[in-house]
Design a protein with these regions (language model features):
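Metallo-beta-lactamase
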Residues: 8, 103-120, 124, 152-221, ...
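Glycine/small-residue-rich hydrophobic helix-like segments
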Residues: 205-208, 212-262
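Cap/insert and terminal regions of metallo-dependent hydrolase folds
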Residues: 99-113, 238-323
Length: 323
């Protein structure tokens, strides 16, 4: 039994559970001053860009976005984020310069090579869902030739047209995703949220989506960092979940309230922030904090994409292992 009453949906009869296997899709070095306040001017952390293989055992009553295993007898393989590209030269010059500013960094071997080394052909990844479209999350999409790509509402427009935001991290490359195999989730603020298969509230989150329609995986709308930013809430066992938080926060101290979101002065004297909409980002972090207080103790583990201490504790569970 759960230690305390929880807001999470109870397990169904014959409830399917997913497995989640973390991977480090490269490493970059981040200066605290760009992410948290207050901060030491020289404080830096070399952090992973985490990606996660989420494996659904099947069968699939509802197969999202028409994506299905090439062999229906095998599980459904979903990648949440793909980390960094495997080589700096696979980025345009503007992003190569940005990565050089994140030294020391490590890009090799890339997620596709790690999957192969662990016994999974990247061609058997059925779906790639991106928390958002930044360079350190979209990885090498062309190495996943059979996957369907899913982004949050507005994500495809970000890739094709950018966001008009300043800062070297706000650089996007049209054509990064194969448009013929890419889809956006519906607008979480639109009408029809309460309809079957549409966005529904869960605890403090106004918009969540039961992705496989079986209570195993919930997409959580977490706006602020970039249009279409998503978290993924995965049911591992009856009373055990993990929420994959992408870039909702970059530092655990933002969750505890020990730090605030950082800003810095750009070359033109304007104020810059790692989040495109800092106020919405603050609200998403507040909701995460509230969510932690509403679920059963130890029932849900939260992990963001750049948590180096979490990775050091859990790298032994990395693919082909599982959490």
């Amino acid at each position: 039994m759960a230690p305390t009453p929880s807001i999470l949906p109870p397990a169904l009869p014959n409830q399917p559970y997913v497995t989640v296997s973390p991977m480090a899709g490269g490493f970059i070095t981040l200066s605290d001053k760009f992410f948290v306040h207050p901060s030491s001017p020289d404080a830096k952390r070399t952090v992973p860009s985490l990606a996660f293989l989420v494996t659904h055992p099947g069968p699939h009553n509802t197969t999202p976005h028409g994506a299905s295993p090439s062999n229906p007898s095998r599980p459904f393989n979903l990648m949440f984020d793909l980390g960094l590209r495997r080589a700096k030269e696979r980025y345009p010059e503007a992003l190569q310069r940005h990565i050089e500013g994140r030294a020391p960094y490590q890009l090799e071997p890339g997620i596709a090579a790690q999957l192969e080394a662990g016994g999974l052909d990247p061609g058997e990844v059925d779906l790639v869902m991106l928390s958002h479209c930044h360079y350190d999350h979209h990885g090498d999409p062309e190495l996943f030739a059979n996957a369907h790509f899913v982004v949050g509402h507005g994500g495809l427009d970000v890739l094709e047209h950018g966001v008009g935001g300043k800062g070297s991290h706000q650089h996007f490359v049209p054509g990064t995703l194969p448009l013929e195999r890419s889809s956006e989730l519906p607008d979480p603020s639109g009408a029809g949220r309460g309809e079957e298969g549409k966005w529904k509230p869960l605890g403090p989150f106004p918009a969540t989506l039961d992705y496989f329609s079986d209570g195993s995986v919930f997409v959580v709308d977490t706006p602020g960092h970039l249009p279409g930013h998503l978290n993924l809430l995965c049911r591992l066992a009856e009373h055990r979940w993990v929420m994959l938080c992408g870039d909702t926060y970059h530092d655990r101290r933002l969750l505890t309230g020990e730090r605030e979101i950082g800003t810095w002065e750009g070359a033109d004297g304007g104020t810059l922030c790692i989040h495109l909409d800092p106020e919405k980002a603050k609200e998403s972090i507040r909701r995460l904090r509230e969510f932690e207080g509403l679920v059963g103790q130890g029932e849900v583990e939260l992990v963001a994409a750049h948590e180096e201490e979490w990775w050091e504790r859990n790298r032994g569970k990395g693919f082909p292992g599982k959490l």
